[in-house]
Regions:
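Secondary-structure transition/capping motifs at alpha-helix termini
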Residues: 144, 165-166, 297-301, 319-326, ...
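Mobile, glycine- and charge-enriched loop segments
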Residues: 356-370, 374-375, 399, 470-480
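PRPP-dependent phosphoribosyltransferase catalytic core
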Residues: 177, 192-193, 228-234, 255, ...
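Conserved short alpha-helical segments that host acidic/polar catalytic motifs at enzyme active sites
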Residues: 1-237, 242-300, 306, 394, ...
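Short, glycine/charge-rich flexible loops or terminal/linker lids adjacent to PRPP-binding catalytic cores
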Residues: 322-367, 378, 405-411, 415
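A conserved beta-strand->alpha-helix junction
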Residues: 148, 153-158, 325-336, 433-451
Length: 480
């Protein structure tokens, strides 16, 4: 058996990250939208914690004038009332971002604002496209001067170039989509239009909302709830939605039958109070727990979830198995992006700063611990150790997703295969490495049952069945 050193700094970061969240507003009554976008981004903060930004325009003002501000940090760190007051405009777009190592900088924050021969556009992007290198070289050859290292700027320049050949911005977006290979949900703002676009596979979510005389575009419905907007519908995979003062129009010419919506939105990324493509995220996680209880039963005294995403699945496991559900963990909500990672010899203490165990809840008991995933195994090992140190007699780990065996090329920060514990170890070996008494994963063939029979999702990180052929070199370092 190949033993993994769980204290190795190579395995220090053991969480999955969604890359971005996008949010846009067009208020037909002329009200400023910067504060509304701020609250929308606040609701999407879980999708990206490294940088954020807002860009706005006044549809009755000078046609090329776009005001924007972006910086590194959380939404409430970057923006204050004074900054928001300076962002005057009734149409706008916002963005929260997580990036991989090496690409985190203010220059790479979004929204991007691009001035070009036909005017100005602002753009927010969630996803990753696979032919960005080729398109970047092509655009550079024809005169594009790139200011960032992200593939989002490639899309912005591509739209600007296509705008030279068609009479409308939405037509340029549609033409650009025909050239982009990969995953993306976009919100594009011109001074008179707000445009939403979703790739033909529908990897990343995007939905439409309405409040009074304002229309919204958002990565998740939870942000619509936060700003008091009603959910209208999801943007369909391949669809381009254009919002103007005359209302909404849609182009579905790129829609296709075969879709590949990211299944991990339901397992982990999306907030539990969101609905994606008609399916409630909370319900899907309850279902995952119920399925685990049927496929991997165990005799135990208490079921606990690793906060926060493990809690609904733990409740579902309890409901199906009859084993009481309990709270074993106290989470420190003040440990965030700025938490200083300890030196290697102190690394074991880092989980204790984030989580503490209620000893009276687990002492002397057989515990079922539910978590959403195991990536490298480091976090699972430390949490199992915390439970046993608190007196748990047995710890049985149940995972509400299949085993991660392959990297993702579509906008999710899943490591390479050599860093995925399940790629090189059997279930029994992983069980020994993390110190659990047993381990069970949700089976791949149960994913459809988890989302109530829906199909058309991407499970490539579990199966290796990529809906788009992955690149021969790893291009995942610069995601939108």
């Amino acid at each position: 058996m190949n033993q993994i050193d769980i204290n190795d700094s190579h395995y220090a970061e053991d969480e999955l990250h969604e890359e971005c969240g996008v949010f846009g507003v067009y208020d037909f009554d002329g009200n400023d939208v910067s504060s509304t976008i701020y609250y929308g981004l606040f609701a999407l903060q879980h999708r990206g914690q490294e940088s954020c930004g807002i860009a706005v325009s006044d549809t009755e003002g000078p046609k090329g004038k776009v005001l924007s501000y972006k910086d590194m940090g959380l939404v409430n760190e970057v923006f204050n009332p004074e900054k928001l007051e300076k962002l005057n405009g009734n149409i706008g777009v916002g963005h929260v971002r997580y990036s991989t190592a090496g690409s985190s900088s203010r220059e790479n924050a979004q929204p991007l604002v691009l001035n070009y021969v036909k005017g100005t556009l602002g753009m927010a992007h969630n996803g990753n496209h696979l032919n960005a290198v080729e398109l970047r070289e092509e655009l550079s050859y024809t005169g594009a001067i790139f200011q960032t290292t992200i593939d989002s700027e490639v899309i912005a320049y591509l739209i600007a170039r296509e705008r030279l050949n068609v009479p409308t911005v939405e037509g340029a977006v549609l033409n650009a989509m025909k050239k982009i290979k990969g995953a993306y949900s976009l919100i594009v703002m011109s001074p008179r239009k707000l445009i939403g676009a979703r790739d033909p596979f529908g990897f990343k979510p995007l939905c439409i909302g309405k409040r009074d005389n304002a229309y919204f575009l958002s990565s998740e419905t939870c942000a619509l709830d936060t700003v008091g907007a009603e959910f209208v519908r999801d943007v369909e995979p391949g669809e381009v939605v254009t919002i103007t003062k005359d209302g909404i129009k849609s182009d579905k010419s790129l829609c296709q039958k075969n879709t590949a919506r990211c299944i991990f939105e339901y397992i982990y990324f999306a907030r539990p109070d969101s609905k994606i493509d008609g399916m409630g995220v909370y319900e899907s996680r309850i279902n995952a727990g119920r399925i685990l209880a049927k496929t991997h039963p165990v005799e135990a005294d208490i079921v606990v979830g690793v906060p926060e995403s493990g809690n609904p699945a733990a409740l579902g496991f309890s409901m199906e198995s009859g084993i009481p559900y309990g709270n074993a963990f106290i989470k420190n909500n003040y440990v965030g992006r700025t938490f200083i990672k300890p030196k290697q010899e102190q690394r074991e203490s880092s989980v204790k700063v984030k989580l503490n165990v209620l000893k009276e809840a687990v002492a002397g008991k057989r515990v079922v611990m539910i978590d959403d995933s195991i990536v490298r195994g480091t976090t699972s090992a430390r949490i199992v150790n915390l439970l046993k140190a608190a007196g748990a007699k047995e710890v049985h780990v149940r995972i509400s997703s299949p085993a991660f065996l392959h990297p993702c090329y579509f906008g999710t920060d899943i490591p390479s295969e050599d860093q995925l514990i399940a790629s090189g170890h059997s279930v029994d070996e992983i069980c020994e490495i993390i110190g659990a008494d047993s381990l069970g994963y949700l089976e791949v063939d149960k994913l459809s049952e988890m989302i109530c029979g829906q199909t058309g999702y991407c499970d490539a990180c579990f199966t290796g069945n990529y809906p788009i052929e992955p690149p021969k070199i790893d291009i995942r370092g610069e995601m939108g």
